[in-house]
Structure formats: C-alpha cells, structure tokens
A protein has these predicted regions:
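Substrate-recognition "cap/lid" segment bordering the active-site pocket of phosphatases
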Residues: 95-146, 160-173, 179-180
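Helix-loop "lid/cap" segments that line or gate small-molecule binding pockets
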Residues: 11-12, 32-45, 101, 130, ...
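Short, acidic loop-to-helix structural element flanking the phosphoryl-transfer center
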Residues: 61-89, 95-99, 128
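A metal-dependent, Asp-based hydrolase signature
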Residues: 27-61, 71-79
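Short beta-strand immediately N-terminal to the catalytic nucleophile in serine-hydrolase-like folds
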Residues: 90, 175-176
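Conserved donor sugar-nucleotide recognition element shared by glycan-biosynthetic enzymes
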Residues: 4, 33, 69, 124-127
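Active-site neighborhood of HAD-like aspartate-dependent phosphohydrolases
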Residues: 1-27, 41
Length: 181
C-alpha cells in the first residue's frame, strides 16, 4: 500500500495539495482513483483525471515496487498449486500493471487467472466487476477441463450458467485485506 499512498501524495502535491494523513491516503486503496480524488479531496472531474495521470506517472516507475507480500503468501500459493487448486487474483490495480507486479514478486507461476481493473472509461473499474470477471474466467477454464460444465454452459439456458457460477462461488475462498474485498 505504500506505493499507492506515496503516489497519491505525489499526485496531490502536483496539484498544490498537501496530504500527510495516512488514514486519508489509505482510503484511496481499492476504489477507482478518479472517484477517490473527487470524493476525498473535492477535485473536479478534470482535476481528478489530472491527479490520476500524475499518480500513474509515479506509480508505473516507482510505486509499483513499493509494496510487499503478506507473510507466508508465497508458501500458501505454492501449496495451493501443488494441491491442484485453481488460483486467481482479483485486484483493482489496473490490469496493465498486474503482470509486472506478479513477476516482480516472483508469484506469476502460482496464478491460473489474474484480473485487474480497466482504466477510466472501461467497464471493469470496481472490485465487484473484477471479481465477476475472475469467475467468468474460471467458468471458461473449467469448460476446457470438465465435460459436465462444458455441456451445461454451452446451452442457451441462462439458469444453467448461473447454477455453474453459484457452484464455483460456493467452492471458492476469497482473501482480502479490507471490507471492500
């Protein structure tokens, strides 16, 4: 989260706003940045978009590397993969940064699916949209591996696909670090 909060500070500084309250800065973690700049610092739409550009200016080169993994997460992911579980990442970080982050932390080999948010204007900007895309990709992955799911998903019956999605959700474990996850 340090990469995010420092990049938010950088963006605000570029707009002449000083913010040192860590609690305020941490509120930016998760929701779309343009919405957060408007909500937490009262920026106009135009200034919020400028702030997002400033944020990314710093984040893409520096902030992306100022984060850390939770203790034991590599071992957990390795164990889950060895046990044959499908592992997926749903993050509100823009999808364009996801491969770099996974590679930097040397964990890309542990994920079957990794989905991030889309940039401004994209349909997938909130965490629930990202999670739904993960489930859609799990369905596709299962279709390739499981004839029963393939047969049910290939029908035009929406309730069959909904049943499959409910089964996948029931068998899923999600780990998050905030109430938004």
């Amino acid at each position: 989260s340090e990469g995010i909060t420092k990049s938010v500070q950088y963006a605000l500084d570029k707009l002449g706003i000083t913010e040192n309250d860590e609690a305020v800065l941490k509120r930016y973690i998760g929701p779309p940045l343009d919405e957060s700049f408007a909500k937490f610092h009262g920026l106009s739409r135009e200034d919020a978009l400028k702030a997002v550009n400033y944020y990314r200016e710093r984040y893409k080169d520096t902030g992306i590397y100022e984060n850390r993994l939770f203790d034991g997460i590599k071992e957990l992911l390795s164990s889950l993969k060895k046990e044959g579980y499908i592992t997926a990442l749903a993050t509100c970080k823009p999808e364009i940064y996801v491969p770099t982050i996974l590679k930097y932390f040397d964990i890309e080999q542990y994920f079957d699916i990794a989905v991030g948010s889309e940039l401004e204007g994209g349909a997938r900007r909130h965490k629930d949209d990202v999670i739904n895309e993960v489930f859609n990709q799990i369905i596709k992955l299962n279709k390739a591996d499981n004839a029963d799911i393939t047969n049910a998903s290939d029908t035009t019956n929406v309730s069959d696909t909904a049943d499959i999605l409910n089964d996948i959700k029931a068998d899923s474990i999600m780990v998050g670090d905030r109430k938004d996850d």
